[in-house]
Amino acid sequence: MTNHKTTIHEKEVHVAWGDMDALGHVNNVRYFDYFQQARIEWLETLKLDLLQTTGPVVVHIACTFLKPVIYPATLILRSSLHSLGRSSLMMDHDLFQDDQIMAQGTCKIVWVDYLKNKSIQFPDEIRMLIP
């Protein structure tokens, strides 16, 4: 497994009023939505045909909430590739507001044969696209 940390995607997140919960800060579930959107945008840059019989599957996701985010807010979400294995990769998601880290997420993605429901090695053409 290759271990390194390379920024692969960065996006601006505009917190919506509906992202708030009863306690007046962004609901914890919304962070996972932000992370998911960043992952999808990054995968789209790889120009993958996601209708194939193989592709990415999220097998683990976690978030550490460091500081509350309160509406209105504009955040920067920086996604990094943490490690790349035979059939899996680990992504880190760092969420910033005014240069302060607000939350840190991690996600494990496995390349899967959808018909066999089994993990497989990253195809060479995909591996070459991943920094």
Predicted regions and their residues:
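Terminal targeting signals and extreme-terminal segments of soluble enzymes
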Residues: M1-I76, H82-P131
